[in-house]
Amino acid sequence: MKNIILSTLVITTSVLVVNVAQADTNAFSVGYAQSKVQDFKNIRGVNVKYRYEDDSPVSFISSLSYLYGDRQASGSVEPEGIHYHDKFEVKYGSLMVGPAYRLSDNFSLYALAGVGTVKATFKEHSTQDGDSFSNKISSRKTGFAWGAGVQMNPLENIVVDVGYEGSNISSTKINGFNVGVGYRF
């Protein structure tokens, strides 16, 4: 699976480099992303989008997201003298590409499809009667990711991006949104 992700990244980067050299119009935006992971709280992070346009109303858009969240619990069980600290971390990343369609000079719609990966780690540390115990369990899964959104150009060189992103990785549903601002050149 790492080879698939690496291959997708190399191909996307190659396309972007070639398109930048021949581009009529490029747009780059960076923004805030937030998603809800099934049976967990919200995770937050960053989303980056690149768009290439020529004279056609149909263009190419790519999206890269990285999000992180954690949950911690500490406490003690007094009769047994146990003190514990647990930490659960979730990291999510996605790489997607797709078409964008310009409806007017200031408004476009886009759809994305690609790959998403989630890594969950559980760390446990406890002490009992002066003895210390630690445990760590980690799992990484990869699956299909999709998205859709709108890009607006309130000014000729400014891009405002609002999008939805979802994935279903190994029966874990991840749904969220992203909002970004960027530059069109």
UniProtKB/Swiss-Prot annotation:
The keyword Signal appears for this protein: yes
Signal sequence range: 1-23
Keywords for the protein's UniProt record, in alphabetical order: Cell outer membrane, Membrane, Signal, Transmembrane, Transmembrane beta strand, Virulence
Membrane topology, from the record: Multi-pass membrane protein
Subcellular location: Cell outer membrane
Keyword Glycoprotein set for record: no
Any single Gene Ontology cellular-component annotation: host outer membrane
InterPro entries, alphabetized: Bact_OM_Invasion-Related, Enterovir_OMP, OMP/PagP_b-brl
Pfam families per UniProt: Ail_Lom (PF06316)
Similarity-based family: Belongs to the outer membrane OOP (TC 1.B.6) superfamily. Ail family.
Role, per record: Essential for full virulence and survival within macrophages.
Protein name: Virulence membrane protein PagC
Organism (species): Salmonella typhimurium (strain LT2 / SGSC1412 / ATCC 700720)
Taxonomic lineage from the root: Bacteria, Pseudomonadati, Pseudomonadota, Gammaproteobacteria, Enterobacterales
